[in-house]
């Protein structure tokens, strides 16, 4: 089992719509640690740490629009 940490920035209509909460929920379902926070430019920063397959699953979820 390989443990990794990764960062992603999500752009678009992601502030004020519950996106951070939904992302945190998905990360918790995968047993990941990290954080999700709003950025001044309107994007959201996501840092996720855990088993590589579970981090990749979260990234796939983000790529599909959350």
From Swiss-Prot:
Secretion signal, residue range per the UniProt entry? none
Q: Which residues form the active site?
A: 20, 38
According to its UniProt record, which reaction does this protein catalyse? Answer: an acyl phosphate + H2O = a carboxylate + phosphate + H(+)
What InterPro entries does the record tag this protein with?
A: Acylphosphatase (IPR020456), Acylphosphatase-like_dom (IPR001792), Acylphosphatase-like_dom_sf (IPR036046), Acylphosphatase_CS (IPR017968)
Record's keyword terms, sorted: Hydrolase
What Enzyme Commission number(s) does the record list for this chain?
3.6.1.7
Q: Which family does it belong to?
A: Belongs to the acylphosphatase family.
Kindly provide the name given to this protein in its UniProt entry. Acylphosphatase
Q: Which organism is it from?
A: Sodalis glossinidius (strain morsitans)
């Amino acid at each position: 089992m390989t443990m990794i940490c990764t960062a992603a920035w999500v752009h678009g209509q992601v502030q004020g719509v519950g996106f951070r909460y939904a992302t945190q929920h998905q990360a918790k379902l995968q047993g990941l640690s990290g954080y999700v926070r709003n950025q001044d430019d309107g994007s959201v920063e996501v840092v996720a740490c855990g088993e590589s397959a579970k981090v990749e699953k979260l990234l796939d979820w983000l790529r599909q629009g959350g």
